[in-house]
Amino acid sequence: MPVPIVIESTGRAERAYDIYSRLLKDRIVLLGTPIDDQVASLICAQLLFLESENPEKEIHMYINSPGGSVTAGMAIYDTMQYINSPVSTLCMGQAASMGALLLAAGAPGLRFSLPHSRIMIHQPSGGFQGQATDIDIQAREVLRLKQSLNAIMSQHTGKPLEQVALDTERDYFMGPEEAQAYGLIDRVLTSRSEATDTISK
């Protein structure tokens, strides 16, 4: 699918942007695909660039993602925590698996969802092949990642680690209100003005 081009008029001049560059100008980062290494590199680069532009100003991350690679998702997560700029997150459509973790990892008070989105949490999975020893090594690594992800989710939601571990044993789907009660988001938004009101407070 071709990337749309938008034309912006400034006085007597006109300038053409691809839509993602235009959003970046407003400090908006869009995660709208499954998460892989290439996507993670692009998202991390945008976050680092926006921090260099103004480390005190908020960055808006809009999420519509089914999740994906754990290591790629953790690169985005660590970058969000590393930079000085606060990152607000907003789920539009769905935030599943690593997408849900990134949604929950937004700055406190700045984690939102639109009213008809869905959020899903679960444990990491992997398909293993090879010799028994290799399979055992991979299985132990998945267990390590599971414990790490559960600890992060517990930290950002305020839920006990044991509860998170239980809830992520299988796919756990939530609507926005349930996700708010769980601690994954802070507020359900129906209009942009509501987000502005929240930030101004």
UniProtKB/Swiss-Prot annotation:
Molecular function terms from GO: ATP-dependent peptidase activity; ATPase binding; serine-type endopeptidase activity
Any one GO CC term of the record: endopeptidase Clp complex
GO biological process: protein quality control for misfolded or incompletely synthesized proteins
Domain of life according to the entry: Bacteria
Catalysed reaction equations from the record: Hydrolysis of proteins to small peptides in the presence of ATP and magnesium. alpha-casein is the usual test substrate. In the absence of ATP, only oligopeptides shorter than five residues are hydrolyzed (such as succinyl-Leu-Tyr-|-NHMec, and Leu-Tyr-Leu-|-Tyr-Trp, in which cleavage of the -Tyr-|-Leu- and -Tyr-|-Trp bonds also occurs)
Keyword field: Cytoplasm, Hydrolase, Protease, Serine protease
Active site: S97 (nucleophile), H122
EC number of this enzyme: 3.4.21.92
Cellular localization per UniProt: Cytoplasm
The UniProt record lists the keyword Methyltransferase: no
Primary subcellular site in the record, as a coarse category: cytoplasm
Listed InterPro entries: ClpP, ClpP/crotonase-like_dom_sf, ClpP/TepA, ClpP_His_AS, ClpP_Ser_AS
Any one Pfam family match given in the protein's UniProt record, by short name: CLP_protease
Function field: Cleaves peptides in various proteins in a process that requires ATP hydrolysis. Has a chymotrypsin-like activity. Plays a major role in the degradation of misfolded proteins.
NCBIfam families, per database record: clpP, PRK00277.1, PRK12553.1
PANTHER family from the UniProt entry: ATP-DEPENDENT CLP PROTEASE PROTEOLYTIC SUBUNIT, ATP-DEPENDENT CLP PROTEASE PROTEOLYTIC SUBUNIT, MITOCHONDRIAL
Record-stated family: Belongs to the peptidase S14 family.
Subunit structure: Fourteen ClpP subunits assemble into 2 heptameric rings which stack back to back to give a disk-like structure with a central cavity, resembling the structure of eukaryotic proteasomes.
Name of the protein described by the UniProt record: ATP-dependent Clp protease proteolytic subunit
Protein species of origin: Nitratidesulfovibrio vulgaris (strain ATCC 29579 / DSM 644 / CCUG 34227 / NCIMB 8303 / VKM B-1760 / Hildenborough)
